[in-house]
């Protein structure tokens, strides 16, 4: 434990900083008719190769972390005249319509009118950061990924659209992971990431507090560039181990030395950025990181004009 103020963390719909919005991935509500495993995908393509145009990789937390493969039919921009020429797709569309029509919930039955579409579509049109909603407490870092818009994220992932290497670097750092461990909920003992509590309350280094610390534009740009370079090095270190899943790479017992070193360099770059917001040069551990982040949170939220949202969770500055 360290000396730190007792702070109430609000549940927020938007982030306290000027950062991209975080949302859940898309929700099919299809009785499995849009979802394909490897065997089904191959069988469909062998039967009618026109189907390949409409098949996308489909990732939830399991697929992201463990490298298992899953696919989906993604028909958001499909030409209706083309779909009508592919009987195997029409069969699945019809099955979705019939299943939704048979449900008890009125909202689900209403969705039967659009059987080509997922029930909830939040798929970005650009690259995005994917964050598993639940991650093992054994990991020092929650494994996140930068994904192409061609990869469809399920509602078992959080999606940060329009994110850059800078955002990926901050979110992948020990600083952010210390915040997660301090304020997130738990599923059994695993960390449950949260948009409203974790992400939207996280105090980023270059929001009002950096101005309070009198950081120059040149200092900010230099710090951002250093984080981006270090984040790229983390991705490069991952790529140097093909065949290893994120679960393999981020198990503390099997984490490769080059990836660990890349994260240490990323942490150094992120910590230096937080110095511009008044942070110390070094931290003895998570407790000191969290104590500083809570003080920065107070400074940043104190500058917000909007009234705080209803209070949900009490944060404790402890390791």
Residue locations for each model-derived region?
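S-adenosyl-L-methionine
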Residues: 1-319
């Amino acid at each position: 434990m360290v000396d730190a103020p007792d702070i109430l963390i609000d549940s927020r719909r938007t982030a306290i900083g000027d950062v991209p919005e975080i949302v859940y991935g898309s929700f099919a509500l299809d009785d499995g008719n849009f979802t394909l495993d490897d065997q089904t995908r191959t069988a469909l393509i062998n039967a009618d190769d026109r189907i390949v145009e409409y098949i996308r990789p489909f990732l939830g937390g399991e697929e992201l972390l463990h490298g298992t493969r899953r696919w989906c039919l993604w028909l958001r921009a499909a030409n209706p005249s083309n779909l009508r020429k592919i009987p195997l797709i029409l069969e699945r569309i019809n099955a979705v319509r019939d299943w939704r029509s048979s449900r008890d919930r009125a909202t689900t039955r209403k969705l039967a009118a659009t059987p080509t579409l997922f029930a909830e579509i939040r798929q970005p049109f650009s690259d995005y950061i994917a964050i598993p909603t639940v991650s093992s407490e054994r990991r020092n870092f929650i494994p996140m990924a930068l994904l192409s818009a061609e990869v469809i994220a399920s509602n078992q992932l959080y999606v940060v659209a329009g994110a850059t290497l800078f955002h990926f670097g901050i979110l992948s750092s020990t600083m952010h992971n210390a915040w997660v461990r301090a304020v997130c909920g738990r599923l059994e003992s695993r960390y449950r990431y949260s948009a409203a509590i974790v992400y939207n309350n996280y105090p980023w280094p270059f929001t009002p507090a950096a101005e309070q610390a009198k950081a120059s534009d040149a200092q900010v740009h230099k710090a951002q560039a250093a984080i981006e370079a270090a984040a790229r090095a983390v991705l490069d270190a991952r790529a140097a181990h093909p065949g290893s899943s994120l679960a393999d790479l981020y198990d503390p017992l099997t984490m490769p030395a080059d990836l660990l070193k890349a994260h240490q360099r990323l942490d150094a770059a992120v910590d230096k950025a937080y110095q511009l917001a008044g942070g110390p040069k070094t931290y003895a551990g998570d407790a000191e990181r969290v104590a500083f982040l809570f003080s920065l949170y107070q400074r940043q939220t104190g500058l917000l004009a909007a009234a705080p949202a209803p209070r949900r969770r009490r944060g404790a500055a402890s390791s």
